[in-house]
Amino acid sequence: MSTRPRKLRITQSLLSAWEWSFKTDNGYEDFLCTLRREKKPPTKAMLDGIQFENVLNNVLNGEIIPTDHEWFSVISEMSEELKGSQQQVTLFKGVEVGGQEILLHGVLDYLREGHIWDCKYSKTYHLNKYLNSPQTAMYLRLVEEAKDFTYI
């Protein structure tokens, strides 16, 4: 009886950590922490991003955002674009790379009619900041019928 090798589960976070490991002095250690799924306290930027996405999701689910809210303008604009989309869509897809079975695992922020959106919260805007992110290619592989992918 032969034993079949386990599929390796790969997330966009792991791919991004691997890519990051080549860019900084302690990038490899950061990658190992991600690989070991070590919990780290969230940074202020991470907490702000989570709060922003929660407010956006609440508005998409019918909540009214007060006009004096600091994010009123951008949340109103984004919620109009994302209206009718599925939120937090978890997907898995098996692929084979070099004879090794791999399970791609992604959680798409928003999906509607072949369009994927990923919400990125930042205090500063840099055009094409995520253009070469491994997340783009991976999510387009997860949703092969997707026509495009937008970071918002």
Put a short name on every predicted segment.
Residues M1-L108:
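Metal-dependent nuclease catalytic cores that hydrolyze phosphodiester bonds in DNA/RNA
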Residues V89-I152:
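Mg2+/Mn2+-dependent nuclease catalytic core
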